[in-house]
């Protein structure tokens, strides 16, 4: 039987960095960097033991970076079109290689990554990497392309704004200009660099990654990247066939057959070749950046090709428009999408002390037909850390939220490295500002470093509270990947208890999960200050589905196993006496 999956997102260059200097805009020598080799057998074993099935190694493909690798045949990147000193992982410079910063020997960087994949597989986990089909770095340059592979734009007709087989869009007759810097910003914080001269040669100028058609994009545009052309004309018309409506209900094999004999834009083939290369390399899946900015037909083509090679590939996409979710799942053949705009945003609102838990069952009801495809998370590299003052200000507030996020549906759960030890992301790293761990700079991750403990990976420097928090995550995640009920049915009992249970409150949430072999009652208290005592009611409808008769049924709390109580069923309705401390959750297992 299929069980829950748990993704551990890790920012690869930060994971093993033990340097604590944390100088804003600091160099690799000053602030340090983590390496592939830091993911030792011991480190991976600890991650696996946390309850993890997949690791998303963020920032692996070779992206623009301010570091001199000329001795390895790599051109220097221009700080005027790089965000931060270490560079954004979403401005990929060479799709057939990996970030040289991550290797102990940059000339052997691909071999070192292959060894990491092998270690990860040996530890019993699968490997996910980023693919960013919407845009590439302004200075894209593949220096290790496989035979027959040419760079993006190499054969483009740059005299045209658009051509179906151009990889980029152009602004003919105009040269690219670096944005006007705002709010005192200077590349590298004003540090000397011979290339930081407010110039970057690009003639003609290309459209920018976020779709800006200006030769001089704005400071808040994705000016370090250029937009990929998928055969969508500047007026939005499509120069490729659209999928017939009935393909919503067809499998990836039918999608693969549909595209097999079609004439397709060149960019489609280029990205298909890139993903096939990494599958052959040993990667088990991809996280697709800004997927909704790329036409859904391309995803049908790409993902059906991926699944033909590896039917078990894990395909996760960043999509933020709920109106498009079903298109990207059914037509685009994505396995999973971020559940940010609905569930994450609702839970964050409650964690910040606003709003009622009532909205959560409403969200789940609206997602009922696609709930398995909506990946749940409370942190990732784009979002604020739970412990940061702009979010909850205290990692403990993540506990009830995490229980709900990880147990309310059959979808995978994702956590971000450091979340399990309450990392607040408090550093001013340079381009990256506090509340998020910087994805642009060389920086240390202090709470996480205490767990790393000089690469013993044993939590030796953690405080008691941090150890307890990590233990909570470990218990919860391990429970979720073993539980059969969490892949079964769901029913909320929250509104019934709001209407019928004295002492129940809108800061509490309750629901049941079950299959033939396991029945669970989940209750969470989101209130940081108030305890609640009430007789939780399990409605007749649930008891009937569970086929339980009147009488007493023992309950065991599943995470810690210490609390044992009973559910009394009388006249077909169940009742459980519950004493909930602030921020406490119970997952009760019904013992038949």
Positions of the model-derived regions?
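Loop/helix patches that line or flank the sugar-binding groove of alpha-linked glycan CAZymes
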Residues: 2, 18, 65, 80, ...
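Substrate-binding cleft/loops of secretory-pathway carbohydrate-active enzymes
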Residues: 137-147, 296-308, 319-350, 424-432
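Hydrophobic faces of well-ordered beta-strands that scaffold small-molecule active sites
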Residues: 6-8, 55-57, 127-129, 286, ...
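Active-site neighborhood of glycoside hydrolase catalytic domains
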Residues: 223-325
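C-terminal beta-sandwich/jelly-roll accessory domains of carbohydrate-active enzymes
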Residues: 528-592
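Short, well-ordered coil/turn segments that N-cap beta-strands
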Residues: 4, 51-53, 123-125, 282-284, ...
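Short, acidic/polar
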Residues: 33-47, 263-279, 398-402
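N-terminal structural segment of carbohydrate-active enzymes
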Residues: 1-126, 134-145, 149-159, 163-164, ...
